[in-house]
Amino acid sequence: MIGDWNNGTGRRKSSVARVFLKKGSGKITVNGKDIQEYFGRETSIMIAKQPLALTSNLEAFDIQVNVHGGGESGQAGATRHGITRALIDYDAALKPVLSQAGFVTRDAREVERKKVGLRSARRAKQFSKR
């Protein structure tokens, strides 16, 4: 599959997206489904397509994405990160534009672990004065 394909791996929260990109008509496939079908929410679709819109390449590439882990928001972010890396692999001249928009940087925020003696990461048990 790698022949004339450019690839990039994107990560966000606990999601990992492997993105394969080649010149084409603008068809985006996520896990074998059309992007509209896979991501139900319009915001998730918009987030995933941001690097293409920024570089005016919405109709220029066919993209195949394999994404797993996490939820819809994390998968959309991982897809955006993967598409960004694949675009840079295709044309390194796009890196400054994508970097300026903040798409090249991996969003390092993760879920904070639950602590012993607390209800969640920071929430303590309810305090009773009497």
UniProtKB/Swiss-Prot annotation:
| InterPro entries (alphabetical) | Ribosomal_Su5_D2-typ_SF, Ribosomal_uS9, Ribosomal_uS9_bac/plastid, Ribosomal_uS9_CS, Ribsml_uS5_D2-typ_fold_subgr
Q: Does the keyword Coiled coil apply?
A: no
**What keywords is this UniProt entry annotated with?**
Ribonucleoprotein, Ribosomal protein
Q: Does the keyword Metal-binding apply?
A: no
Q: List, alphabetically, the GO terms of the cellular component aspect.
A: cytosolic small ribosomal subunit
Q: In which domain of life is the source organism classified?
A: Bacteria
**GO process terms (BP):** translation
GO MF term set: RNA binding; structural constituent of ribosome
PROSITE patterns from the xrefs? RIBOSOMAL_S9
Concerning its family, UniProt says: Belongs to the universal ribosomal protein uS9 family.
Extract the NCBIfam families matched here: PRK00132.1
Name recorded for this polypeptide:
Small ribosomal subunit protein uS9
Name its species: Delftia acidovorans (strain DSM 14801 / SPH-1)
Q: What is the lineage of its organism?
A: Bacteria, Pseudomonadati, Pseudomonadota, Betaproteobacteria, Burkholderiales
